[in-house]
C-alpha cells in the first residue's frame, strides 16, 4: 500500500515551489570553460572553516551527542553578555528557523503578512506555508517604503 504524502499536506505547503540552488562549481566550469570559480552564492564560504573552528570541533568531546535542546547554558551566557533576561532569547538554526517558528505560532489564514518587495526570501515562503495573505509593498527606490508598510497594516 502506498501513500502520497503530498496529498496530505496543507494547500500552503503543497503550493510551495522547491528551492533550486545555483549551479555547482563543476557545472559552471564546464559550461563557461573556466578553470577557477569562486562561488559566492548561498552564503557559502569559499575558504572553508578557519583553523580555530577546526581545533574547537576537534576538542569537543560530546559532538556525537544531542545538544541541550533548550540551549540553557548558551542562553545564560548570551543574556549575561548582552544584559538580557534568559527568557527573552530564542535560539534557532538560523533566521529561517526562527521566522518559521514565529509564523507557525502566531500567523493564521486570517492574517496578512506585510513585507517589502526586496526583503528576505523566507517571508513569502513561511507566509504561503501557513496559508496567510501576502502584503508585498513595492520598494521606494532601493529601500523599504516604511510609510506604505505602516499604512498597509490592517
Which residues does each predicted region cover?
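N-terminal "arm"/small-domain region of PLP-dependent enzymes with the aminotransferase-like
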Residues: 2-65, 150
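Conserved core of the PLP fold type I
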Residues: 64-154
